[in-house]
Each structure stands twice: as C-alpha cells, then as structure tokens.
C-alpha cells in the first residue's frame, strides 16, 4: 500500500511538471508572436466541458465519500475563493485572449492578474495531487482537465505583462511563475496528505469555477458552432473514459 502511494505521488509530481511546462509554452506563444488563437479557443472549449464533467462526476462525488456532506462547504469555499480574487482584486481580462496596453496601463493591474492566476494554478497542483492520493484514475482525469487550460493561462499572464510594458523576459518569467505555483500545490498536498478531505473538495470548487465562469464565457463569445461541439465532446470524453477504464 505504501509503495503504491509512493508511485502515485511520483506520478503526481511528474505530471505536475508537465502541467507547469504548459504554462511556459503558453507564455512562449505570446512572446514569439506566433500564437495560434483558434488553437487556444479549441483548448478552452474542450477544457470547459471536460473540467465540468470531471468536477461533477469525479471530484465532488469522491469528496463526499471522503468527508460526507461537509465536503460541499469546501466545494463552495473553493468556488468563491477564486471569485474573490478575480472580481475583487484583479481587473477584468479575457481568459486565453491577448491583452493590449490600453487595457492594462497600470502595474497594479498586472500584479492583480498575476495573483488571481497564481491562485488558479496553485489549486491546479492541489487538484492533481489530491486526485492521485485517492487513485491513479482520479489523478489522471484531473491532470487532463488541468492541462487543457494550461496554455491559455500562460498565454494570458504573458500577454498582460507585455501590455504593461514589462518586456519579453518578464512575460516568460510570469508564465514560469504560474508553473511553479502548480508544482507548489502538488508538493504541499503530497506532503500534507492528512488534509486530503479538505484539499480535494476545495480543488473541486476551484475547478468548477474556472470551467463555468472563466472558460465557458470565452467560448460563448465566439459565434462558432465547432466550439460548442467541442464543449460537449469534452463532457463525452469523460463519460467514455469512465465506461472504458474506470473499474
């Protein structure tokens, strides 16, 4: 049992690194100016459906099994924790979109966006590690959900830093900082395994928030039927994976 847990913890750390690399790659697209906007939109759409399905079909039910009805309080707390940072401290920005100088003229805006996204990415890591502490299956489906929005996260923060006149190096460093926050979430959760009954439902609330209020609205702004189909494909992929692999 201990050996199996050690293997799952190692898998969480390894996939946390992969997720962090996704943040860095998103920032690289902005700095290089060869960003595939439509490609990012497809990631957002697929990720929105997939994340919502994982939250409601996997994370929240597992949280209830771990902590009973009290888990729902922590789901709600995770949801509104991100809402607090995004809508109280951070200025308005579009997730996965390029930000221009006239929209982000003050360095406080840059810091606020950075803080909000770091909260996101920290809980990305918490979610990955919490999932693997429960089972390899749960950790894997959560990792996929996290990875699908890593490019847009890195893209967004690097774009904000460039719009604030911080230069390419700082933009890449900001994207790297998001990746580091993800790794920190993985490591802290792996070390504090006794707090799993709180960490998993909190990450469930954050996952629900990111999918429902960050990703889906961006998809709905685009009059593109392909994006709507991809949202449903994201949901369907979780159901198919459950049917084929989840014993």
Locate each region found by the language model.
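Intrinsically disordered, metal-sensing/regulatory segments
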Residues: 1-247
């Amino acid at each position: 049992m201990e050996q199996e847990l050690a293997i799952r913890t190692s898998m969480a750390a390894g996939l946390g690194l992969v997720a962090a690399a996704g943040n860095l790659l998103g920032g690289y697209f902005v700095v290089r100016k060869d960003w595939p906007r439509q490609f990012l939109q497809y990631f957002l759409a697929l990720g929105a459906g997939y994340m919502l399905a994982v939250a409601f079909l996997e994370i929240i039910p597992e949280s209830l099994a771990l902590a009973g009805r009290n888990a729902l309080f922590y789901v709600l707390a995770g949801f509104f924790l991100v809402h607090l940072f995004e809508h109280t401290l951070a200025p308005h920005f579009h997730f996965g979109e390029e930000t221009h100088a006239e929209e982000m003229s003050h360095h406080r805006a840059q810091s606020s966006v950075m803080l909000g996204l770091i909260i996101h990415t920290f809980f990305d890591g918490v979610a990955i590690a919490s999932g693997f502490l429960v089972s390899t299956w749960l950790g894997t489906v959560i990792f996929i959900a996290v990875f699908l929005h890593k490019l847009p996260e890195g893209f967004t923060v690097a774009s904000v830093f460039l719009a604030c006149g911080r230069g390419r190096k700082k933009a890449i460093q900001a994207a790297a900082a998001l990746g580091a926050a993800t790794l920190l979430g993985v490591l802290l959760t792996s070390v504090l395994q006794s707090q799993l009954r709180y960490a998993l439902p909190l990450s469930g609330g954050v996952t629900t928030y990111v999918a429902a209020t960050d990703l889906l609205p961006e998809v709905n702004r685009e009059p593109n039927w392909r994006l709507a189909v991809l949202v449903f494909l994201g949901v369907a992929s979780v159901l198919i994976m459950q049917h084929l692999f989840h014993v």
